[in-house]
C-alpha cells in the first residue's frame, strides 16, 4: 500500500515516556511518507498511545476508539492502531472488544512500528505484545517542540509496587548505552534544542543491566556517571531528568547535580505516602524518614532547588491517621509541585485484590484536602521568587495573551513576560519577577543571553 498521500494523527495519553514514544512513532510514520493531520477525522491512520495508570485514562481510550470504529465502517481503508500500556495489558482482548482495530502494540514495540504496519497493509490484523529487546531507533523523532526534547535512557521497571501496573506493561529494565544517549543528545544540540529531559520510569536504575563493575564494586555505568558523560554536549544549555525513586537516590547523584552547571536544580521524586506502614504495603522500599533525609541533603547542597513529587491518597486500608501523616510530610517539606491522585485499582496488581478498599467518597475527600494543602504550600514556595532575577528559556507564546511569551526557570517554574516569540523562542532571557502565583510567575525582561558555543 502506498503511504505517500496518507495522513496520520496520534493522540497521546499519560506520562512523558508515552509522549516521547509518540514522537518516535510520528517520526517513523513521516519516514514512511505519512503527513501529519491535526484533525483525526481527516487522518487515514489514527494511533492512540495509551495509559493504564488510572481507570479514567483507560476508559477515555475506549470512548475515542468507539467513535473511530464507527467511522471505519464508512471508510474501510482507515487504519486504527492502539499502542502503549492499555494495548500491552489487554492484548488480543482489545481485538475482541473493538474488532475494527488493525494493530495492537505494547510500548516495547514502538520502534518496530514500520514493520508492524507493513504486516497490517499486507492484510493482517496484528497483536505485538510479546517481550522484546528494545531496538535503537535510527528514525528522527517528530518533536512537538523545537526548544525542548525528551531522550529515553532506560526503558521498563523492575520494581514491584503493589499498586502499579507499569512493570506488567513496560517490561524489565533495559538501559541504553551511554554512547547511544550522548549521540542522540549531540544530534539534538546540532538541531538547536536547548533543553533535554532524560527519561526513565525509574531513572536511578540506569545501568544496572549494563555489563561491568568498578574496583569499588558498584555498577560501571550509573545515572550519575551518565550525567557526567553527557553534560558537556555542545548546544544543549539545560539538562533535566525524571523520574527518580527514593530507594536508589544517592548523595553522589545530588553532588553531581550541584557540580554540573547545565543540570537544572529541579528534582521529581515521588514519595506516594507519608506513612511507613502504607509505604511497606506499597512495597516502596523506603521510609518517610529516608525520604525526608533525601530532601534535606538536596537542600544542603542546593538550598534553592525545586522539589516535585507524586502522592496517592485512599490506598487500601489507609486510615485517617495515616492520611494525616501524608499531610504532615507535605506541610513539612513544602513541595513546589505535587501530582496527586486517588488510588485506582489496576488489573494484575496485588493491591487491587485486597478487601480493604476505601469508598470513593473517602478518597475524594482526602484528595480534595491534600490538593488544598498543596496549593497553599506551592504559593508559599513561590514567594521566594518575588523581586528576583531568573533565567527563563523561552518556549512558546502565551496562548491567553499574545503580547507575552512563556518559558521555564531552571527550577521549572512557568514564567510569563512581554515579548515577541519570533525573536525570543529558544533564547535564555533574564527576567525580573514582579508577580508570583502558586505554580507560575510573571516578570519583566532584563537581558537576553545567547547560547554560547562550547
Curated annotation (Swiss-Prot):
Transmembrane segments: none
Domain annotation Radical SAM core: ranges: 143-380
E.C. code: 2.8.4.3
Lineage top rank: taxon: Bacteria
Residues annotated as domain MTTase N-terminal: 6-122
Subunit field text: Monomer.
Protein name in the entry: tRNA-2-methylthio-N(6)-dimethylallyladenosine synthase
Organism: Nostoc sp. (strain PCC 7120 / SAG 25.82 / UTEX 2576)
Gene: miaB
